[in-house]
Amino acid sequence: VERDASSQDSFSWPADPSVLYMARSTYKRLCLGAVSVPYAICIWKSWALLKCKIFAWLAVQHRIWTSDRRARHGLQDRPSACYTCLKEEDNAEHILVQCVYAKEVWHTMFDALSLQANIPDAQDHLLGWWLAQRARWSRDAKRGFNTVVIAVIWALWKQRNARVFNRTNQQLNAPELASSVIGELKE
């Protein structure tokens, strides 16, 4: 680097030469090329607990440890059946939206909260269904709806895990689970 001792030093900010420094230009420079995830706001801007948000983030990316994921990673021979209905494969989509028990919980929850939302059907995927239902709400109501969705999928996951790890066949029925979720939401 050659320096000219006869000229005065000057300060400039390469991200935005018109100004000396701005946090906004630094942020933009650091995030250049960052991937935009359209569903991130659904999760991270909700009122749900952090552990529930983290679970939802993993669930929509199919990164929760269901038996199909363990089988894909060679941790078990083959996927096992859903621990709730014993009919379909134990995977994230089935546990959270496609299982008969999950549908009953969604229906009960929406009725209890008087929410006008469609219950997921057999072909729905969590993220697609969630984004479609979310689009029906006003800007202010979306945050509340997102919180309800996250709370319900967290409760369904906890019910599934109680059966898997506690080896119990007892589970809360849909009204009991919905009541439990509503109680947690009020806290």
Regions found by a protein language model. Name each.
Residues 1-187:
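Charged boundary/loop elements
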